[in-house]
Amino acid sequence: MPRIKSAIKRVQIAERNRLRNKATKAMVRALMKKVISLSTAYAANPQQETLQEIQAAMSAAFSRIDKAAKTGVLHKNTAARRKARLARIVKLSVASSEKSQAEALVEHG
């Protein structure tokens, strides 16, 4: 254990920052999981409300990821990769649901 007052303070600050960073990373993961679960739900049962929820959740996730990158919790390339993955997942789920809707219209029309 440190004996010098400034070293003791640095240990306290490091612990505080570690807990803050841990909470930020957990929030990013939770928001990403929410976007992914909403997009899979939309792919299974496409509804306009679900699409709006996806857009809102994606906006919140992007905002939190950008903030984590800005404060140094995440590396900027890691943040960019996570945002790209989320965007790709949402794009694929929306495209697959639109494709299935078009096929259903062709069958019934």
Swiss-Prot record:
One of its GO terms (cellular component) is small ribosomal subunit. GO terms for molecular function: small ribosomal subunit rRNA binding; structural constituent of ribosome. It holds the Pfam family Ribosomal_S20p. GO terms for biological process: translation. Keywords: Ribonucleoprotein, Ribosomal protein, RNA-binding, rRNA-binding. Binds directly to 16S ribosomal RNA. Belongs to the bacterial ribosomal protein bS20 family. HAMAP family: Ribosomal_bS20. This is Small ribosomal subunit protein bS20. The lineage of its organism: Bacteria, Bacillati, Cyanobacteriota, Cyanophyceae, Synechococcales. The gene is rpsT.
